[in-house]
Design a protein with these regions (language model features):
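N-terminal glycine/serine-rich phosphate-binding loop of ATP-dependent small-molecule kinases
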Residues: 1-111, 126-127, 158, 219, ...
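Active-site core segments that coordinate phosphate-bearing ligands/cofactors
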Residues: 2-12, 18-19, 85, 123-139, ...
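Short N-terminal micro-motifs specific to bacterial/archaeal maturation
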Residues: 53, 113, 136-139
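A general alpha-helical scaffold signature found inside nucleotide-binding enzyme cores
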Residues: 57, 61-65, 143, 442, ...
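Carbohydrate-associated surface elements
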Residues: 118
């Protein structure tokens, strides 16, 4: 049987596994075969909007995006293999973690979806962090809930279910109110040993709001927590229609627990074991390090989440990464079009990224402050993208692009230095993935300089979270009894896959250190810009 015939047989017999991830600018669907290789894909571009001071996506945009990405994947199957996609072996959904989707008993959304990007919960996050003696970031679901309580928002007493984006989609397609443990860890603190929400902190929260007289206790409105590998329901008839507008997809497909983009990133990079880590760099950027032991102190810059299997993870999350860089690349594309030069997006990015490597190691006196939105790691409530240079700086394209690439990781470096230098966390391997690493060697070398550590990029780096989600669904479907997620990934998924590792260049490391000090000094100007403009 040829490779193509095997794939056709896999699809026709319903052994293909589907992963769909809702990123902040793209919804991607990936179908994999029994060897965990992508065999079809579809995607849909979308953008959050700022409405009444809230970063949000509308419900109709969520469903339109889901249906379009699935339809494109089904079309890819039809065009490539000349068959109709009607059956699946398993499905998994993932999305941007955190945020706030509150529903009443009639399953109606009570307020517009508040995404992770909002930095409106400072008071709630501070009170809860002190109450729990545990860092509660502003974007966590519990911070959004408590902020709504502090503001006296009327909808709170009507809440019947509080979910995330991935949890919402899973619920609508299966009627199951569940999330994976990694996704849950971005809603409320987790007790890794119990594999559930931290019971003591939950009691503290209920006591904190007891005088409000709400008709619910916190556990009653949060989704049930499941570790990777558990079955989390099946696709209902209504769910199948919601996913596939053509009506071809058969219901009854098993679904794994929905996970967050952090968990799918760990899975896609084989970073679920202790002393491993990964950096996901796109619109936002985060680094996750699986810990050997708890941190010695609470750090407001460090979030504690878990792997999809429930092991503790230290996470540095920054709201801003490549948005400003992407905007400048868009400007250069527009400039090229004035001269009737049509460059495709990939060529444009790779050309400009490669150009950056010719720049001065410290960017020659240029600083890009890339804050589109607020940045809790550095204490900014709002952002104003800004480019600064000294009069004696060398203004050239290479330094300009290099400064924007450095900026995309500078805030991450500020947070990571706490883990590496203050907490003395040990890391054996770091894997990079996401859009920043698509151009060979560039994002990888910049991250190696930022962390002063070797960075690996896998041949699957461009697959990203949707592929990681498909792997989690495949793990549920195909694991042996008692087989851990780490062992499954090692033996079944990554044994044959290649990766390239790049050691840090010492001159780059020194240049990035200089740049980061200047970047931190320029945050005073950024704060002033927020006030003035």
């Amino acid at each position: 049987m040829t490779k193509r015939e095997k794939i056709i047989s896999c699809i026709q017999e319903g052994r293909g596994v589907l992963g769909i991830e809702f990123g902040s600018t793209r919804i991607k669907a990936v179908l994999i075969d029994e060897n965990h290789n992508p065999i079809a894909a579809g995607d849909h571009e979308w953008e959050n909007r700022l409405e009444n001071g809230v970063w949000t996506y509308r419900l109709e945009e969520i469903w339109e995006g889901l249906q379009d990405s699935y339809a494109k994947l089904a079309e890819d199957v039809k065009n490539t293999y000349q068959i109709q996609l009607t059956r699946l072996g398993a499905i998994g959904f993932s999305g941007m973690m955190h945020g706030y989707m509150a529903f009443d008993r009639e399953e109606k959304l009570l307020v517009p979806f508040r995404t992770w990007r909002n930095t409106m919960t400072e008071e709630a996050a501070a009170v809860l962090s002190e109450c729990f003696a545990f860092n509660i970031p502003q974007r966590w679901s519990i911070a959004h809930l408590y902020q709504a309580i502090l503001k006296g928002e009327e909808h709170v007493e009507k809440i019947d279910y509080l979910s995330t984006l991935a949890g919402y989609i899973h619920w609508k397609l299966t009627e199951q109110r569940v999330v994976g443990i990694g996704e849950a860890s971005g809603m409320f603190p987790i007790d890794s040993a119990a594999g559930d929400y931290d019971a003591e902190m939950m009691q503290k929260f209920d006591a904190l709001v007891a005088d409000k007289g709400f008709p619910w206790k916190l556990r009653e409105i949060l989704p049930k927590v499941l570790r990777a590998g558990k079955m989390a329901g099946t696709l209902t008839k209504e769910g199948a229609r919601l996913l596939d507008r053509s009506g071809c997809l058969q219901p009854g497909v098993p679904l794994c627990p929905p996970e967050g983009d952090a968990g799918t990133g760990m899975t896609a990079t084989k970073s679920v074991e202790k002393r491993t880590g990964n950096v996901s760099a796109g619109t936002s950027v985060f680094a996750m390090i699986v810990l050997e032991k708890p941190l010695s102190a609470m750090h407001r810059e460090i979030d504690m989440v878990t792997t999809p299997a429930g092991d503790p993870v230290a996470m540095v999350h920054c709201n801003n990464c490549t948005s400003d860089l992407n905007a400048w690349v868009g400007l250069f594309a527009e400039f090229a079009e004035c001269f009737d030069i049509k460059a495709d997006k990939n060529t444009l990015f790779s050309t400009l990224y490669q150009k950056a490597m010719e720049g001065d190691k410290d960017c020659g006196g240029m600083i890009a402050c890339n804050y589109y939105s607020g940045e809790p790691v550095t204490g900014l409530e709002e952002g104003r993208p800004m480019f600064l240079r000294r009069p004696d700086s060398h203004l050239g394209l290479a330094n300009f692009m290099r400064s924007h690439l450095y900026a995309s990781l500078a805030t991450l470096k500020i947070g990571l230095d706490i883990l590496l230098k203050e907490e003395d966390v040990k890391i054996d391997s770091i894997t990079g993935h996401g859009g920043l690493f698509k151009t060979k060697g560039v994002g990888q070398s910049i991250l190696a300089a930022a962390m002063n550590a070797p960075i690996s990029v896998m041949e699957t780096a461009g697959e990203g979270g949707a592929w990681g989600m498909a792997l989690l669904a495949a793990y549920m479907l195909s694991k042996k009894d008692g087989q851990s997620l780490g062992d499954y990934l090692d033996s079944r998924v990554f044994a044959e896959r290649k990766s390239e590792t790049m050691e840090p260049d010492l001159a780059d490391v020194a240049g990035f250190e200089t740049y980061t000090k200047q970047y931190q000094a320029c945050l005073a100007a950024e704060k002033a810009a927020v006030q003035a403009f």
